[in-house]
């Protein structure tokens, strides 16, 4: 990873790249080396999901190539290998509350994956699909609590912060 002239968030980028490069798939054997390299360019700055987009594009491109080489539909290949509740991720963490299969099935239906693309009346030349996993530095569990106050009001406490991911209540 290009760290620029200063480390800033580069250690986080290197960690995220290593953790998420395997995608949301069941793998029995996996290894990643990830480095932040100092260069004479501006330092990398913060953004949501640093490194995740890079490794997702690379990994999901490989999934398509592998499925094609095996003569398999890329969606069916993903559905067969995607993580489900109780699976252990390559980091050793047992995964819970996963909905990748439902996500893929709903998306495939919603975008008309099995219909052909009208190339004569469109500037589209094809379509693709990708599935990602995002790491977090916080625990992977959260909690919500409602307190009934003495004045009759309720106070909602949640263990998340709204950073654009849709947790705003």
PLM region descriptions:
Residues 1-53, 121-169:
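Gly/Pro-rich active-site capping loops and adjacent beta-alpha segments
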Residues 82-153:
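Helix-loop-helix junctions that connect adjacent transmembrane helices in secondary transporters/permeases
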Residues 43-111:
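N-terminal leader/propeptide and maturation segments of large enzyme subunits in energy/redox metabolism
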